[in-house]
Amino acid sequence: MLYIFNSFDNMWVDFIEQTKSFKVSVNNYFYYLNKIKKLFTYLNDLRKHILKKYVYTINHKRIAINYLYFSMVTGLSGAALATMIRMELAHPESPFFKGDSLRYLQVVTAHGLIMVFFVVVPILFGGFANFLIPYHVGSKDVAYPRLNSIGFWIQPCGYILLAKIGFLRPQFWRYYDKTSFSFPFLEKMKYNQYKEYKNDYLFYLDFLKKEITDDHSFFWKARKVIKLPQYSVFSFVPLKLMMWKTMINYPESFWYAASRVVQSRRKKVFVTKCSARTLTTAGWTFITPFSSNIKYTGVGSQDILILSVVFAGISTTISFTNLLITRRTLAMPGMRHRRVLMPFVTISIFLTLRMLATITPVLGAAVIMMAFDRHWQTTFFEYAYGGDPILSQHLFWFFGHPEVYVLIIPTFGFINMIVPHNNTRRVASKHHMIWAIYVMAYMGYLVWGHHMYLVGLDHRSRTMYSTITIMISMPATIKVVNWTLSLVNGALKVDLPFLFSMSFLLLFLVAGFTGMWLSHVSLNVSMHDTFYVVAHFHIMLSGAAITGIFSGFYYYFNALFGIKFSRMFGYMHLIYYSGGQWVAFVPQFYLGFSGMPRRIHDYPVVFMGWHSMSTAGHFITLIGIMFFFLMIFDSHIERRAATSSTLGLPRWYKRISYYIFKIRYLQHNKAKMNGIPGSTVRLMLIDRHFAEFEVFKK
């Protein structure tokens, strides 16, 4: 009996313990369930916060920072394409592309267009212009904030199309590259036999079936027979569901079908042995007839390229229209005609915005005419039917050469802000500096022909373009001399923006001198198609323009993000990036003197030494870019507060005059701005030593 009671007691104890453990497990379950619920609530709130802060925002400062982040991403993709190019050229016998010269040309095309249209332009006119102009003209925001947001979100559309050109394999586009960052957008449709049945019997697109196709040469005589394995089939789906999927997954099918329908009226078959239909080999300059004729370039890729440039042009047009209207309608009373109150960087940006307003429609008209020539059988650039292929080069370079000044003149503004800040004295002859950039910009409209010495221009045109190109060195010389004089007799404070400015000055001098040599017709004829030209414009754009942008970025870093930048990573960025530029592009001058042609993926072994050095310089530059992103991450993680110490006691005696200068300079500016009727003054912090007073309406 005792045994039974003990057993019952043990069973009861076990039951109580199991109940307790069950309660504990239930409590733990609800505890972790509550934690998961809080986590999902936090993630949902974070998603709403990110959408509200970055996607739905119409604030000019946030949109400007979005432009900067976007340009960082596109810059990395452009650098990846440049790495492919340098790895191909590091050694003869085509080590990277395995002899595929067309693929090499496609990568070069995408690299050039990404760097010009989706890196430098968004940084300057989407980032800095959107952030600074409302401050400097005295408005609370731009004239059309929602239009400003639309202009930003058009940029990624064009970039995705262009990245699709650069990061895909040379096969037909139904086979996408899984190593590409864009592969989620390129998932191919599943094979459907029923759709193929309807495609064959309802639409009877027999020329899109898998079959052997004759290849015709330029003389309309069959030379050989090529096989097109697994040729893509036009999928039959409803129109509303078909359009986006077709352009993303099967662009060659869509454009090839449309072009063949029109071309059949002229009884021509545009199939060639020159290039694969999905490759863009016309280059970033849209050389005709390669870009205007399906006979020479990709059936779908060149059209996607044209559409990408149109998207970039629409975004740029929205930006410069919005900012120019802001300047015209929202500027302070008295500010509109008193240029002396406006900072130099804003004067430079407004000048280049007006330049963009005149040259962007020209490029848009040129690429639209190319699209018409390709698909609607117009003959703007078709010589056999009365067109002029040289006209497209005139249109492109009328845009292309002023575009160089559009990219370099805003960096002049950054230098003119940094030099007086670091040297405790104003810029030498500010009015001459302003007139110099105006003369440089207006003369830039007259020299586009020096890119076309080899197309058959007569000697009078060559002489005119050469003379004006030489004359354009005078305003550039005025600027360099005034910057040098601004450094004399001052209490110089050497910091990171100032060192980037000096690096910019050296790179700009070398790029300008080498450009002046190219202005001479006799030298240009022998050097035009060599690596000398590649070195010249890369030192001007990748060297001078990007270095000037970095100087402005570090100068306005505290104003942009409200924190101080990491000095250690910043100085490493300066050393490696500037050093890498010299090591990468100076050897290319010697390659040009030796006769190494550009746009060629292979070369004799005699050029391997200079090419290897140039490739090493490229990787040194990539290390500098790595330090730049480390600086961004470290600055945002540490979040050191940007505090003003303008009135602090200086450590060194030579800084006494520096602080006195800044105090007097700020007091002078504040007195001038308070004199404008209907205005008040606010403070925009630049760095821990310096700030600017800006005006805005009451």
UniProtKB/Swiss-Prot annotation:
Residues annotated to bind Cu cation: H401, H450, H451
Bilayer topology annotation: Multi-pass membrane protein
Reactions that this protein is recorded to catalyse: 4 Fe(II)-[cytochrome c] + O2 + 8 H(+)(in) = 4 Fe(III)-[cytochrome c] + 2 H2O + 4 H(+)(out)
Chain residues that bind Mg(2+): H528, D529
A GO-annotated cellular component: mitochondrial inner membrane
Keyword Manganese: no
Stored Pfam families: COX1 (PF00115)
Domain of life: Eukaryota
Cell location: Mitochondrion inner membrane
Cross-link 1'-histidyl-3'-tyrosine (His-Tyr), sequence positions: H401-Y405
Function of the protein: Component of the cytochrome c oxidase, the last enzyme in the mitochondrial electron transport chain which drives oxidative phosphorylation. The respiratory chain contains 3 multisubunit complexes succinate dehydrogenase (complex II, CII), ubiquinol-cytochrome c oxidoreductase (cytochrome b-c1 complex, complex III, CIII) and cytochrome c oxidase (complex IV, CIV), that cooperate to transfer electrons derived from NADH and succinate to molecular oxygen, creating an electrochemical gradient over the inner membrane that drives transmembrane transport and the ATP synthase.
Family affiliation: Belongs to the heme-copper respiratory oxidase family.
Subunit structure: Component of the cytochrome c oxidase (complex IV, CIV), a multisubunit enzyme composed of a catalytic core of 3 subunits and several supernumerary subunits. The complex exists as a monomer or a dimer and forms supercomplexes (SCs) in the inner mitochondrial membrane with ubiquinol-cytochrome c oxidoreductase (cytochrome b-c1 complex, complex III, CIII).
Name used for this protein in its record: Cytochrome c oxidase subunit 1
